[in-house]
Curated annotation (Swiss-Prot):
Its EC number is 2.7.4.1. The keyword Lipoprotein does not apply. This is Polyphosphate kinase. Keywords: ATP-binding, Kinase, Magnesium, Metal-binding, Nucleotide-binding, Phosphoprotein, Transferase.
Amino acid sequence: MDDSSLYIHRELSQLQFNIRVLEQALDESYPLLERLKFLLIFSSNLDEFFEIRIAGLKKQITFAREQAGADGLLPHQALARISELVHEQVSRQYRILNETLLPELAKHQIRFIRRRHWTLKIKTWVRRFFRDEIAPIITPIGLDPTHPFPLLVNKSLNFIVELEGMDAFGRDSGLAIIPAPRLLPRIIRLPEDVGGEGDNYVFLSSMIHAHADDLFPGMKVKGCYQFRLTRNADLSVDTEDVEDLARALRGELFSRRYGDAVRLEVVDTCPQNLTNYLLKQFGLSESELYKVSGPVNLTRLFSVTGLESHPELQYPPFTPAIPRLLQKKENLFNVLSKLDVLLMHPFESFTPVIDLLRQAAKDPNVLAIKQTLYRSGANSEIVDALVEAARNGKEVTAVIELRARFDEESNLQLASRLQQAGAVVIYGVVGFKTHAKMMLILRREDGELRRYAHLGTGNYHAGNARLYTDYSLLTADVALCEDLHKLFNQLIGMGKTLRMKKLLHAPFTLKKNLLEMINREAAQAALGQPAHIMAKVNSLTDPKVIRALYKASQAGVRIDLVVRGMCCLRPGIPGVSHNIHVRSIIGRFLEHSRIYYFLNGGDEKLYLSSADWMERNLDMRVETCFPVEGKKLVQRVKKELETYLTDNTQAWVLQADGSYQRLSPTGNQNPRNTQATLLEKLAAPVLTAR
């Protein structure tokens, strides 16, 4: 099982996922603005890929610490393959934008008007807007010995300008840089009396190109070309060597804007001598240069995808269901004392989770609340309820993961807010990210203390709960709540790992038990008994888990996997993974739930988890994995998982060579769209009595 040909390179697999995202932009079954959104998500994903993954590979090379993964590729070999693939896909992305999406948008009177098509009225309006709103904010920088090349912010829009002539001081540098401040909009909507009927926009870059002369009076502008630099954005706080993690992170957040260069994007009209000059300034090679036929910062077009004037070009709105029993506005503690409630977001509302916390904040019988927070978003109702609870005298403890990537700053702010309200704030465990999603409420009832809990596969983020598929379990199960109590004490205090009755948790018992359950299925198959594993995760990269799955496949276990993103396992290899089937679902909602199912000799075991099957999750994070109990709930989740395995419109099947093949209905097959089916049919949760 150590043969490198049995494994797919992690970063190459991640790129394959992003290619599947880009493919959605060509899918005419989606509304037009949603197709544009997929194209922009491709850009956003690629930005993070370069900021984190490419930066990490380059760092290994720089410090001569190249290490091959299970696939055998060294970082410099992987970078060569990645560069070739990304160049190909970025060119394709701009072709889709320019040749397909923009013409289609224009048919619906959504236009991005290029300079060559500006009317006199538009030119006049743009000149006035540039003079009043843009020029006062822009600071052009001439390049000479007293004006060295500026330190440019990560992913900022900039222009390199070729000049001719001498300025008032007799300087003749020939080059200047125009940084475009982030506060400036990248697209500007024209008034209807200027642009005409519909939604008409001009690019900020076009405005600056048109009026660059105004920024260098008396000099001739020979050329003005936009470019964008991507930098290493991974934080490098040594958690073992800092006394105050919050203070150390604040310092690193500023440094992140100016990390090492990893990619240069320039408009394709930029002359070779100028691109060479920029590459030299940033210490980049030709393979790290991306010439694009359009704006270099496509992610700033996201504002257009939610146009109120064109609801017909967007997904139809929907209202997540509220369980009928919970619609009665009954005290949630009374409900949960009798029943477990399982919710599948976004098809079912996240509101009951928020309501439980709100009721706890106001309830005089509630004594304490403990909560983990990884990503919560701006204006979080969850955080509002925790603040209210603390102000009402409850013992509120929040375990906040300050190192949640790209949410560090907002998490620092909410930590301060909770501390000011009187809550106890803990920053997790040194060396281990707290990724678990759990809430525990302690309430006095009839002279006794009783616990209530929420466990989830997704974040306490109401916005994500409308866009991501996730599960929530609301419960008063005594054993599960006792396990959570132990885990919170372990996070907040000190002590050895305590034995859990039901909960599996990383980095202690989850991986060990996961491997044991896989091996148990293999043992069943070896005895000629039925054996089946089904799982749905975001990523599968852990070599130990992959090897266990290979051995189970060899023993005869049928293994059905739904892996949205990275998958380093190769299915369909004769004699190794011929019993393993892997598919990825890409659709309206981001697939985010983690489900593990084992036939277990007929005594079915089904778990929900916050953890993907990755080394970082199973070995280096605090994660939870909790059982779904009760025949009705088990069958419900099992059927929902099986729905993903029958999808033939949003499913992409992984081939042994690492490529993906999109499924479509064949013959007399009816189209089966998992997300549409769940959206239509999932009206209320199944409740199970205890």
